[in-house]
């Protein structure tokens, strides 16, 4: 179940990109599209983080505080990474600031919405919160591996990483989840 939650976050991002999320093609003239694609991916990841915070706070104050601190500890590095990436691909400063503001707002807005939606329900239990965090991690892994890392490591901007390797990795996670493990 844990591996499936991680895999689902990854596959949802793959599906979003396949069905219309701006797809970066890693050419110099497509730097705006690449920046937008990475930003939208990180906004989706941050919204999933906000979902986890809102659900955990509606479940218990202690769990909510732990999840909030854990998520807040990586927001700074995530924002730094996004701003560094946008600078690396030469996105104009005003557009980069707008992307960072949208990224910064996505977690708190989703946390507030989730809190009020779940505060009197039975969904907000620790097991579901853990699954939500793993889903969020899957979205982040997608953005990092499919959009950001290929651009940072490519010297030739006309080569996309083959989708077959991405799908193979997703299948391996699924397979290991099916096989399980013993203690």
Tell me what each language-model feature is:
Residues 1-183:
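Intrinsically disordered, metal-sensing/regulatory segments
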């Amino acid at each position: 179940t844990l591996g499936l939650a991680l895999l689902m976050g990854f596959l949802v991002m793959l599906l979003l990109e396949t069905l219309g999320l701006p797809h970066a093609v890693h050419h110099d003239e497509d730097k705006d599209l690449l920046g937008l694609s990475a930003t939208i991916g990180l906004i989706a990841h941050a919204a999933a983080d906000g979902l986890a915070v809102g659900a955990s706070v509606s479940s218990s104050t202690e769990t909510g505080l732990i999840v909030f601190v854990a998520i807040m500890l990586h927001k700074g590095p995530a924002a730094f990474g996004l701003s560094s990436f946008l600078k690396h691909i030469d996105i104009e400063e005003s557009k980069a600031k707008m992307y960072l503001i949208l990224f910064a707002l996505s977690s708190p807005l989703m946390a507030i919405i989730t809190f009020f939606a779940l505060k009197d329900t039975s969904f907000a239990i620790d097991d579901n919160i853990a699954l939500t965090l793993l889903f969020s991690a899957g979205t982040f892994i997608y953005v990092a591996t499919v959009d950001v890392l290929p651009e940072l490591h490519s010297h030739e901007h006309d080569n996309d990483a083959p989708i077959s390797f991405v799908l193979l990795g997703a299948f391996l996670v699924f397979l290991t989840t099916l096989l399980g493990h013993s203690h």
